[in-house]
């Protein structure tokens, strides 16, 4: 079973990317579980046909700890299983603790004992800190993919996340599998993201063109099954195949901020 975490800057498209690429893997016959690690609880909505899912933390607050697995785990497109960690009540507690609580509960309820090929963690966080680092810190995720674009904050976040991976690589065994460029129509962005990937010792595993990016439709089925060939769906199917066949897993070499800014200036991102 491969355990994969998807990180990246807030709003970069982690949840859309995760759900579409897992749908592609599901169409390949892979058995998958998505664990949403974001208080917004939108990591499984598309694969569940647009339906909101009750979160683990909400369920625990309302029903206590004596719950069954199917109370918090739902099955959607291509047999993909989905769980949402959720978050604390607004203004109270730490959202990162919700990830720790949720993964612990899933382990106790036997979710990881199923015949799974992949577990994907869709993780909130521009920086890898606290509970949001749990999939990395505790060795739950062995491979990380960072969704980014050729913009300063997207690449700054990617470099920060690489620092977190590097920090926990020896204790947790986690490795970076590559950068996924979610295009924002920036001039020369494939070259820039590839340059940054090379600089930190990894690869740009796939480039999703801006004209191919999926808008948030109500369901994955409509996204992956109703388009002509070589459209959005095929981009994510290609990404799924690349991740399934990927064998490049590295301990990244994060850059200093000065080095990152120098590269951005070379590419005209900073004046």
Swiss-Prot record:
- Which sites bind ATP? 8-15
How is the cofactor bound, as the UniProt entry phrases it?
Binds 1 [4Fe-4S] cluster per dimer.
Q: Which CDD domains match?
A: NifH (cd02040)
- A Pfam family that this protein carries is Fer4_NifH
- Binding of [4Fe-4S] cluster occurs at 94, 129
Cofactor(s) needed for function: [4Fe-4S] cluster
Residues bearing the modification ADP-ribosylarginine:
97
> Which reaction is this enzyme known to catalyze?
N2 + 8 reduced [2Fe-2S]-[ferredoxin] + 16 ATP + 16 H2O = H2 + 8 oxidized [2Fe-2S]-[ferredoxin] + 2 NH4(+) + 16 ADP + 16 phosphate + 6 H(+)
Q: How is it modified after translation?
A: The reversible ADP-ribosylation of Arg-97 inactivates the nitrogenase reductase and regulates nitrogenase activity.
> Which keywords does this chain's UniProt record carry?
4Fe-4S, ADP-ribosylation, ATP-binding, Iron, Iron-sulfur, Metal-binding, Nitrogen fixation, Nucleotide-binding, Oxidoreductase
| The keyword Transferase is annotated on this UniProt entry | no
UniProt xrefs under InterPro entries: NifH/chlL_CS, NifH/frxC, Nitrogenase_Fe_NifH, P-loop_NTPase
Enzyme group, top EC level?
A: oxidoreductase
> Which terms in the Gene Ontology molecular function aspect does this entry carry?
4 iron, 4 sulfur cluster binding; ATP binding; metal ion binding; nitrogenase activity
Query: What EC identifiers does the entry list?
Result: 1.18.6.1
Identify its protein family: Belongs to the NifH/BchL/ChlL family.
Q: What quaternary arrangement does the UniProt entry report?
A: Homodimer.
Q: What does this protein do?
A: The key enzymatic reactions in nitrogen fixation are catalyzed by the nitrogenase complex, which has 2 components: the iron protein and the molybdenum-iron protein.
NCBIfam families this protein is in? Answer: nifH
Q: Please state what the protein is called.
A: Nitrogenase iron protein
Species name: Ruminiclostridium cellobioparum (Clostridium cellobioparum)
